[in-house]
Regions:
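Long, low-complexity intrinsically disordered regions
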Residues: 1-224
């Protein structure tokens, strides 16, 4: 598929692209060529070393991107992670929340959301413990609830936190620092004077413009 996106070599280049096109899944989106992994230069993709260890510049850029743009990051695209610019967030949020109303406070999702709102940002394992998901097999169940809240735009990733070794070097895959978008940017960041269906139509037409070879079915699946 011809997406006509330039090759990206840095976090700065990725930020400029996200600002320009508005939506960008991190990995496979179901639309050929439309992901950060597809767009970055080969040197910025995941690689393992013969002597052990790995490097993945794109993975390391995520925190810099969400902190410096800023933009929204979470599992927004068919339960997979990606970026949405602040320009497009009000329409995306307007549509998604019309499909997924705020959960009842006495539901599990409602408890997770109210816990996060009362404590402020928490890494995933801290939020899981605060909500009582500490038993065997609870991690995957909790992750499922989190994904639903991210798809509904009630929770986003504020940053990524990495453990440090004895030399104070970051290592590992890192942990998502979760927060609500309202706490991060205020309710004014959500102001949208369109109906949910008008927002949907605006997003659909925009994605058709930047992805001319994608089918309607592919774009509908991406929007959710």
């Amino acid at each position: 598929m011809n997406t006509d996106f330039p090759k990206i070599y840095s976090a700065t280049g990725m930020m400029e692209l996200i600002q320009k096109i508005g939506f960008l899944p991190l990995l496979d989106s179901g639309i050929d060529g439309f992901s950060a992994e597809d767009i970055v230069d080969e040197d910025c993709r995941y690689v393992t070393f013969p002597e052990g260890g790995w490097d993945w510049p794109l993975w390391k850029w995520k925190g810099e991107i969400v902190q410096e743009m800023p933009c929204m990051y979470g599992k927004f695209f068919n339960k997979k992670a990606g970026f949405i610019s602040q320009e497009w967030w009000p329409d995306f949020c307007n549509y998604r929340r019309s499909k997924f109303p705020r959960p009842d406070e006495d539901s599990i999702e409602g408890t997770i959301l109210s816990t996060l709102q009362s404590t402020g940002s928490l890494i995933t394992r801290e939020l899981r413990a605060a909500c009582g998901f500490t038993g065997k097999g609870m991690r995957s169940k909790f992750d499922g609830y989190l994904t639903r809240l991210e798809m509904a735009t009630y929770i986003v990733t504020e940053d990524f936190i990495y453990p440090r070794d004895k030399h104070n070097h970051e290592y590992g895959w890192g942990w998502s620092l979760l927060n609500t978008p309202e706490d991060l940017y205020g309710r004014e960041a959500f102001q949208c004077n369109r109906t949910p269906q008008e927002s949907y139509k605006r997003i659909f037409e925009h994605l058709k413009e930047i992805l001319p070879d994608a089918s309607d079915k592919q774009i509908i699946k991406l929007i959710g």
